[in-house]
Regions:
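Nucleotide-activated chemistry modules centered on ATP-dependent adenylation/adenylyltransferase
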Residues: 1-134
Length: 134
């Protein structure tokens, strides 16, 4: 059921970005929600299992410009992944950035683990993607 519904669901932060290229509403493929979606669906269903149409379908096809929206979020994830790899204990602190977790004190380690696993999913998705100013 989820696999069938995933193609008609919308995660993109700006699904009308493609209108300037004559495209309809669709996932851009490179914003934060699209990257998390792609990483999660690839983890769940394997490479090629995500039937979603993305404006930028292949993140590896060419270097992504970090001065443009296509490369900014990729580079941000690359920095975050490298930072967490160097200091894994940071996850326990970073989970508090969105807001208070005072009502979840007994679950902080589990929440930090969700954060780590989520970044690991994105890391697998963007492994080998080149993001730099062009």
């Amino acid at each position: 059921l989820l696999k069938n519904l995933a193609t008609v669901s919308l995660s993109c932060s700006s699904p009308t970005k493609g209108r300037w290229r004559g495209l309809g509403i669709q996932h851009c493929g490179y914003c934060l929600p699209c990257l998390i979606r792609r990483a999660a669906l690839t983890t769940a269903w394997g490479a090629g299992g995500d039937a979603t149409t993305y404006t930028v379908n292949d993140l590896h096809a060419q270097p992504l410009d970090t001065r443009e929206s296509t490369g900014k979020q990729i580079r941000s994830f690359q920095y975050a992944i490298a930072r967490l790899r160097a200091r894994p204990q940071l996850a326990n602190l970073l989970i508090h950035k969105p807001g208070s977790l005072a009502d979840e004190l007994t679950h902080l380690n589990e929440l930090a683990d969700v954060y780590r696993r989520g970044l690991a999913e994105v890391e697998r998705l963007i492994d080998g993607v080149e993001a730099r100013p062009s």
